[in-house]
């Protein structure tokens, strides 16, 4: 590290609040830049987090049907409100991708990872002043377990046999099989800790949590207002006094709101205008690359998608580079009909799983095998699924003609898309933010019993490998299993996955943020509200 890099490192420590003025000046003196030290420190101190102000943000994915039940969280608006503002998990994926403790200070497993003990953080209070206990954690986890739970996270916890409190500060979770990634699962945005009602249920209706902000007003899908929790247990987090979250589904409306100063930050910047937006004075466009993915789920329980030859034909008529250029405007990379992305460690290489290319002749062959040479299908899309989803459908319609396939693109309204179209229509547009581990995304979306198995796909070999991979502690063997699972999804699954997308957000230049931003979800891992500040 040269002197310039060392100075930047010290300044970053000042910004993050981990280096005092005295220590900075002493370090600068030792480096031989003592005369410049006060100026260098002042510039860093000015960028350091400061409390105060109201952050106004334009979010997508809200609906008037949204509820405060964490098990029913569907999209960005409620993820940000519940996961990012008012509640906490046991664990958290840091901006670095490392798993750290949130309401669990630490955890340990037995030798085969079939039992996990979580040590619950002491001195934490809910917004109503109630102290956090192990029983709150037990009831919050059980809220997502069992056939009657109805939680979208139930598929993640099917292997849980029991959750019990061991005194007031320990929670013991026993699993039916080993799961080396189980603590990662508990960072899922559904598995939030709520106060226990004392009868085994939790109080989710009040919106009470342990998070950095307290819910004051909530008009589902339209507007929410929170204020800083004065007793927040995290040091160096939650700097804004107030948060106003607005549901802005239309990308042009979001952009206009930012340009006119009606909001301070927006998510899902319209990719075709991102370059121009970034040139406007006072606005900063920030792309982050992770596992966010465009998917086109086909319901494999309904004709004609119950025939894998049809599914393969539709995967083969997508001109992926066209999508990257014309839909993503270069913000992303090609997908290969499997959900394991660039931020996952066991991703199959192109040598292991060759990139699928546009091949209308091969698509014709598959349709001939299915005896459906003149296939006609409907594709349902709305821009809330992903920016440009309807345009993508049009591109696909044109590229499918060479294979003799007629695709009727049906534009759907943004409002109600996730409740009325996704998982209801036979073929639709969707997106996923990806997951930190292979087991997580496979268990939540591709397992036969997953509540979000939006293709209704069931593959016995895949599901057996899922259990094996989850319990395997040897990294090399684990990789072999997950690569094989990716091949199965690629060749048999009900999802066409053309692209991995960068998350592109835009902020006004008055907002300060850490140098490293989380890429596990949008908006700094959906923790922007507690990680950012006004400069």
Name the predicted role of every residue range.
Residues 58-111, 142, 208-210:
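N-terminal lobe/hinge region of extracytoplasmic solute-binding protein
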Residues 119, 153-196:
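Surface-exposed binding/hinge segments that line
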Residues 334-369, 386-389:
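Structural transition elements
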Residues 356, 402, 408-417, 441-509, ...:
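Extracytoplasmic/peripheral linker and loop segments enriched in polar/acidic and small residues
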Residues 84, 94-98, 186-238, 242-244, ...:
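Gly/Pro-rich hinge or "lid" segments in bacterial periplasmic/extracellular proteins
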């Amino acid at each position: 590290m040269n002197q310039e890099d060392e100075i930047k490192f010290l300044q970053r420590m000042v910004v993050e609040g981990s280096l005092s003025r005295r220590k900075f000046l002493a370090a600068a003196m030792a480096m031989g830049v003592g005369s410049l030290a006060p100026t260098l420190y002042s510039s860093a101190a000015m960028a350091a987090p400061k409390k105060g102000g109201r952050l106004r943000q334009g979010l997508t994915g809200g609906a008037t049907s949204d509820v405060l039940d964490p098990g029913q969280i569907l999209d960005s608006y409620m993820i940000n409100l519940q996961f990012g503002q008012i509640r906490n998990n046991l664990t958290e994926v840091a901006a670095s991708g490392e798993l750290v403790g949130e309401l669990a200070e630490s955890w340990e497993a037995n030798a085969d990872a079939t039992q996990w003990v979580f040590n619950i953080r002491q001195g934490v209070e809910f917004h109503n002043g109630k102290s956090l206990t192990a029983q709150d954690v037990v009831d919050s986890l059980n809220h997502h377990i069992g056939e009657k739970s109805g939680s979208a996270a139930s598929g993640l916890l099917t292997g849980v046999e029991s959750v019990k409190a061991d005194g007031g500060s320990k929670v013991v979770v026993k699993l039916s099989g080993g799961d080396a990634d189980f603590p990662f699962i508990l960072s899922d945005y559904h598995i939030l800790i709520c106060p226990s009602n004392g009868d085994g249920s939790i109080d989710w209706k009040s919106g009470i949590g342990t998070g950095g902000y307290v819910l004051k007003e909530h008009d589902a899908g339209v507007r929410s207002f929170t204020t800083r929790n004065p007793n927040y247990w995290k040091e160096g987090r939650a700097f804004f006094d107030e948060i106003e979250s607005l549901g802005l589904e239309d990308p042009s409306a979001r952009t206009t709101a930012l340009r006119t100063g009606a909001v301070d930050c927006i998510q899902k910047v319209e990719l075709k205008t991102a370059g121009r937006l970034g040139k406007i004075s006072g606005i900063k466009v920030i792309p982050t690359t992770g596992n966010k993915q465009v998917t086109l789920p086909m319901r494999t329980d309904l004709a004609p998608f119950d025939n894998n030859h049809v599914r393969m034909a539709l995967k083969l008529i997508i001109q992926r580079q066209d999508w990257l250029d014309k839909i993503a405007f270069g913000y992303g990379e090609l997908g290969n009909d499997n959900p394991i992305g660039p931020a996952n460690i066991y991703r199959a290489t192109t040598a292991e799983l060759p990139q699928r290319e546009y091949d209308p002749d091969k698509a014709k062959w598959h349709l001939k095998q299915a005896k459906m040479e003149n296939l006609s299908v409907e594709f349902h899309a709305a821009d809330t699924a992903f920016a440009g989803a309807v345009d993508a459908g049009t591109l696909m319609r044109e590229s499918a003609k060479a294979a003799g396939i007629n695709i009727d693109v049906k534009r759907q309204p943004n409002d109600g898309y996730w409740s009325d179209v996704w998982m209801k229509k036979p073929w639709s547009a969707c997106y996923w933010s990806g997951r930190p581990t292979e087991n997580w995304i496979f268990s939540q979306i591709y397992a036969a019993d997953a509540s979000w198995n939006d293709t209704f796909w069931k593959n016995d070999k895949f599901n057996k490998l899922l259990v094996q991979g989850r319990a395997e502690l040897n990294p090399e063997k684990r990789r072999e299993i997950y690569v094989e699972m990716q091949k199965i999804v690629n060749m048999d699954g009900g999802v066409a996955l053309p692209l991995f997308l960068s998350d592109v957000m835009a902020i006004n230049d008055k907002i300060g943020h850490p140098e490293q931003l989380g890429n596990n979800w949008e908006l700094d891992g959906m923790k922007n509200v507690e990680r950012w500040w006004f400069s």
